[in-house]
Amino acid sequence: MVEIIGERVGEVVGSPQLQQIVLVEIPTAGGSRERVRAEFSAVVAGGAGQALRPGDAVIVVKSPPPDQTYFVADRDRSRPLAFIAAVFVALAVLLGRLRGVTSLVGLGITVVVLAEFVVPGILSGASPLLVSVLGALVIAVASIYLAHGFSRRTSIAVASTLITLTLSAFLAAAAVSVARLFGSGTEEAFYLQLGLLKQVNLRGLLLGGIILGAVGVLDDITTGQAAAVDEIHKANPALPVRELYQRGRSVGTEHITSLVNTLFLAYAGASLPLFILFTINTYQPLWVTLSSEFVAEEIVRTLVGSIALILAVPITTQMAAYVLGRGVGQVRP
């Protein structure tokens, strides 16, 4: 954006709205740059500086004929996002070294699985739940082995993740069915039912989202729990399986209390505006708000993920105690 030609603050549905006429510079087909007038509007919220300033990178859209006017759709945030991503990659490599590199490769595989398998599979009319579960299994296996290497305790974490993920799929299906959720609680779900995408199974899509969301937290707790039991076993190889399990459970209890709270805060942070609306809503009782499709979906998502975390601890601990305590899979001289 080059210059502000004019601006004013109007009112739309009782809310102040900023309206600006600005001069922007856009590239042309011949490689040169052209200056055009464009309109920009934004709701003035919380005193935030949403007004455009000279030097801002913006996304300009041209309306179709016969008007062919220009308007600013949004700010171009590609450069700051690329910078933040570069900092993330640099820190992962600098602090994680080889494991940091392999974890980034695992992240890349996750993106590829989602973009090339899960999304196309859902768009082709396949069951969103089945596609998401298969994608989650591939993501779990690839990301855990790449991030933590090939070892007995990593294989224990992978097996525990797959078992817990399968149980979570059944649990999510039961919870969605009992709560009578249909996956239509968000604006995005509404748009998916329009046009060519109306064949998408929204309930299956909701279930698939719950499963994919559980993979990341399961990865964390199963690898950490398997590592804890392994270290206890190395410190005292003479411990019987039962004692190894009990000591591992003691560590797992700490994992549960911290990660359940972490999972809740992750959802709460993403839905902070919704929490604020709860506090100022005086038109209907709280139980009515909680029963709405959108809120109930988030509650089920959080609770299923938390239950998956809780189940992962005894499953991983029992498997690790048995395999490590009895020397299953150990190469003997």
Regions found by a protein language model. Give the residues of each.
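Extended, hydrophilic extramembrane loops/domains of integral membrane proteins
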Residues: 43-79
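Helical hairpin unit composed of two closely spaced alpha helices linked by a short loop
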Residues: 215-223, 229-278, 282-283
